[in-house]
Structures are given as C-alpha cells and as structure tokens.
C-alpha cells in the first residue's frame, strides 16, 4: 500500500510510528470467524488476525485510551489480495462517527495515514466491504526524523532477504528451489541528532522498539509505497558524536513481506 497524508504534506525525512496506543485495548467486531478474534488487531503479532465469519460488510471497533494521535497504520492484512474497500472512522461524543479515509488497496503491504493535526476519539472503527484478514492496527504520535536519508541507504522494500533450498541432480542440473522465508532488511544511520531532541523524542521510540515492532517509511515524499512494518534485532543505542552536543545512532530493520 502506501503512506499518505490527510491535510499533511509528506516530508523527505523518515517517518516512524511506534508506541502504539491500541495495544491491549478492548476490541469488538460485527462477527469473527473461528480462530480470528477481534482482539488480534490490538497486539503487534503478525500471525494473529481478525476476519469476519461471513462475506459482505463487516467492522472491527477498538476502544481508544483518550490520548491524542496523529497517525493510523494497518499491517498483516489481505485487503489488497481480496480487493477490499475499507473505511477508517473515529467516534467522539460530540460528533459521533466521523469517516477519516476510504481506500481500496491493490497490495497487502502496510498502510499508514498521517494527519496534519492531532486527533482524539474514544473509538476507532475499520469497516470492510468484503471478507478479509487484518492483523495489526496502530494509532499514535509519529516520530518525524529531522534529517533526510539519501546516499548509502538500501530502500526497505528493495532490501529483500530470502532463505531458500535449491535442489540439484547428481549431474548438476537445476531441479527447483523452495523459498523457506522471505522478508525485508534495511539499515538506518542518523548522524548529528541533537542530544536534547534525541532524549525527548527518539528515545521513546528506542525504548518501545525493545519489545514491539513499528512502521517506518524512509523517504515518504518521493517513495510513499516504500513503507514496512518491522522490528530491530538488537537494542538501539546511540553514540556521542564528539561534536558539540550531538548523538549518532544506527539500527537495522527486519520486516515481514506481505504484498
């Protein structure tokens, strides 16, 4: 899918969505197939998913904790494969249900919606017009990196990592190949981040990334389709750059491929 802005111009610098407000929040659905509960959308796992029991229009509704958010994201879904049109709506006691966006994706890759200002609702609802699976839903305050990335970075969705087994005959003929695991991997390097900015903003993400995945788009304005839902394989730790009051940080993102 993509990262898009609603009354918001996407920047050149990376956007990260972590610190999900929806983790562990109550969730209900108009219906749920066996083994596909509504509660699946409020944990960060990609293999647990909600799916309605029948076709036609269905919805999953998630309680919000009464905190501001400016970004919503969806991952681990089959909306593109199933040709689904979905609508995200928010509920408040003053306005009732307010539609935020309607989309018809063509792939199963992550979707990220960035608002130009913070919102607050008591509930979030995702309505789909036909049967599909949704595994991950995030809402929170995005982290806008102050520095852009240009040279030396492998775009996330081009950094394919594939583990496979190749079958060959005794005479060396190619007999086939079995893909055992496929995903993405990309390394991020940021230099000269202000120490105060790091402690106030980036460190919240670094702490959350110890236990939870996150959404990241490396160049939103130019490559809005290149967004992934991934995790780090080690703790994110900064280094003092030695120049005035700056910190450098490096980390690697590993992501599952859904599209």
Regions found by a protein language model. Give the residues of each.
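Beta-strand signatures of extracellular beta-sandwich domains
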Residues: 85-89
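Extracellular/virion structural assembly segments
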Residues: 1-59, 63-83, 94-96, 100-259
């Amino acid at each position: 899918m993509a990262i898009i802005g609603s009354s918001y111009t996407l920047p050149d610098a990376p956007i990260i969505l972590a610190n999900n407000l929806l983790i562990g929040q109550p969730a209900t659905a108009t219906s749920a197939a066996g083994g596909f509960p509504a509660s699946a959308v409020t944990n960060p796992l990609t293999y647990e998913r909600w799916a309605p029991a029948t076709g036609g229009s269905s919805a999953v509704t998630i309680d919000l904790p009464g905190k501001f958010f400016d970004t919503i994201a969806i991952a681990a879904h089959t909306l593109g494969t199933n040709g689904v049109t979905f609508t995200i709506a928010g509920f408040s006691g003053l306005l009732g249900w307010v539609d935020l966006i309607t989309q018809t994706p063509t792939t199963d890759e992550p979707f990220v919606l960035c608002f130009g200002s913070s919102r607050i609702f008591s509930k979030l609802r995702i309505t789909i017009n036909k049967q599909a699976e949704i595994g991950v839903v995030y809402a929170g305050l995005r982290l806008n990196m102050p520095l852009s990335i240009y040279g030396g970075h492998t775009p996330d969705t081009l950094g394919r990592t594939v583990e496979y087994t190749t079958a060959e005959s005794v005479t060396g003929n190619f007999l086939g190949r079995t893909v055992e695991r496929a995903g993405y991997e990309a390394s991020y390097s940021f230099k000269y981040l202000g120490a105060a900015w790091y402690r106030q903003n980036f460190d919240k993400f670094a702490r959350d990334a110890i236990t939870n995945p996150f959404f990241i788009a490396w160049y939103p304005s130019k490559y809005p389709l290149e967004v992934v839902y991934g995790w780090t394989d080690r703790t994110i730790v900064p280094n003092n750059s030695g120049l005035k009051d700056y910190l450098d940080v490096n980390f690697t993102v590993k992501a599952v491929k859904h599209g």
